[in-house]
């Protein structure tokens, strides 16, 4: 069966929108779960406060984007778009994850199946957010420069436009990877700090040795 390439191009943003809807439905389902005891809520709020720090990534991304203007202002904009969508997907995933972890712990008190379902759907939101926002970002750049091709005399041929679009996609990917790199480094440090803190609490307050399997 032959499929028109133009039809496939327009199916990409439609698939992205459907993915956002599914992620929204899963998020709503997870948020309906109870957050457990008051002590669990206190711990969950502390985790949420520390995990939502994205200010440093935004500042560094803007600095790099300014430097990229020397190459091409369009690549700089693509870099910012990539960094924005990467940070947005991380923000959505982190927000749902830190909200679902305490709900997963609360669900485990009632049923292991409910706990597994809560954690699975909470994690699915992160995966969907990454894929969907990547699709929408690349598609947005494609349609933007498709419009410029029809209204800008700088592109003398289809091949010139295609080459420029590839550079923009590279700039978009660089921005997305740049933001994701700092998010991963920050997340690793935060996770290790939480691990060490848990070991200290178990050792000092509960009297459990550091190498004990219970700690």
Annotate the PLM regions:
Residues 2-215:
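Hydrophobic, small-residue-rich transmembrane alpha-helices and their short perimembrane loops
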